[in-house]
Amino acid sequence: MSQATSGTSFPIFPVSDAATTATSAVATRQEIQAAAEVGLYANAEHDACGVGFVAHIKGQKAHSIVRQGLQILENIDHRGAVGADPLMGDGAGLLIQIPDEFYRAEMAKQGVELPPPGEYGVGMIFLPKESASRQACEQEMERAIKAEGQVLLGWRDVPVDRDMPMSPLVREKEPVIRQVFIGRGHDILVPDALERKLFVIRKTASSKIQSLNLTHGSEYYVPSMSCRTII
């Protein structure tokens, strides 16, 4: 008996159904065991419900890119994870270049003059509503900045629209959102070095805050901290 494939004949030998079933069962058990040991996905892998990209082909900055990014979020609303409550999803956001001119104007209102672009970083931070826990988180962030030899330039309260439709559960968990501005220290000569320092600062502060076992410490989160981009 033979079967033609791409013009070539290969012999086919019949195999009993019982043998095939037994072999498949063994393979399945081995696969399940392997998955139980290491998990279904590699630890370094991350997934997103929906992702879109907008860029200027010549690298020029434009507010239209942000507008188009917001339009993408609306267009992929069906890809967002939503539970029984349609007003409670798993979150969404934009990753953009640091808007230097905007931040420069905003921080000038506090009397803070930002260094040139690339010589400062911005951390977007979710903080607990409870005052004592929030202050403890901010203090640990400031300690981490100082310990790494960098400069605390100041904090900025991020304005939010609380009139947006929101479920009671989401409103209860809504964080205080602040941005921390960090200037480069004397030991930092290039943006790549500052980017690495910001990574260390974020990890150091987060680890310390976790170890404090604050009443509302789980509400602390840093979506981004960089001298190039912000979420």
Name each region found by the language model:
Residues 2-231:
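N-terminal segments that mediate ammonia production and transfer
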